Swiss-Prot record:
Residues 21-99 form a coiled coil. One of its GO terms (biological process) is FtsZ-dependent cytokinesis. This is Cell division protein ZapA. Signal peptide: none annotated. Activator of cell division through the inhibition of FtsZ GTPase activity, therefore promoting FtsZ assembly into bundles of protofilaments necessary for the formation of the division Z ring. It is recruited early at mid-cell but it is not essential for cell division. It is found in: Cytoplasm. Keywords: Cell cycle, Cell division, Coiled coil, Cytoplasm, Septation. PANTHER family: CELL DIVISION PROTEIN ZAPA. Belongs to the ZapA family. Type 1 subfamily. Homodimer. Interacts with FtsZ. InterPro entries: Cell_div_ZapA-like (IPR007838), Cell_div_ZapA-like_sf (IPR036192), Cell_div_ZapA_eubact (IPR023771), Cell_div_ZapA_N (IPR042233). The gene is zapA.
């Protein structure tokens, strides 16, 4: 699908961006989220300069993204460790099962 121009409003300013039709809702949601963040930031910080607010919001979003990436890395490492432990447990159980089967076969001979 080719991108099509979409008009969005960010903090009172019109912005035209190209967006694939199937991502239009996500773009509008992102714009709404950014508008809310900017409004909240303006109220909390009393900063009135829009450019400063945008930079502060961008830094906050970048920080949040870095935190989420770190969480994802930690989770992936934890899952890899659990998978290795499960593999070892399964391998050990299979070895034990093989020994039991071997002993049972020897007893019947």
């Amino acid at each position: 699908m080719s991108a099509q121009p979409v008009d969005i409003q960010i903090f009172g300013r019109s912005l035209r961006v190209n967006c694939p039709p199937d991502q239009r809702d996500a773009l509008n949601q992102a714009a709404d989220d950014l508008n809310q963040r900017l409004q909240d930031l303006k109220e909390r910080t009393r900063v009135t300069n829009t450019e400063q607010l945008v930079f502060i919001a961008a830094l906050n979003i970048s920080y949040e993204l870095a935190q989420e990436k770190a969480k994802t890395r930690d989770y992936a490492a934890s899952m890899e460790q659990r998978i290795r432990m499960l593999q070892q447990t399964i391998e050990q159980a299979l070895l034990e099962q093989g020994r039991i089967t071997e002993k049972t076969n020897q007893n019947f001979e």
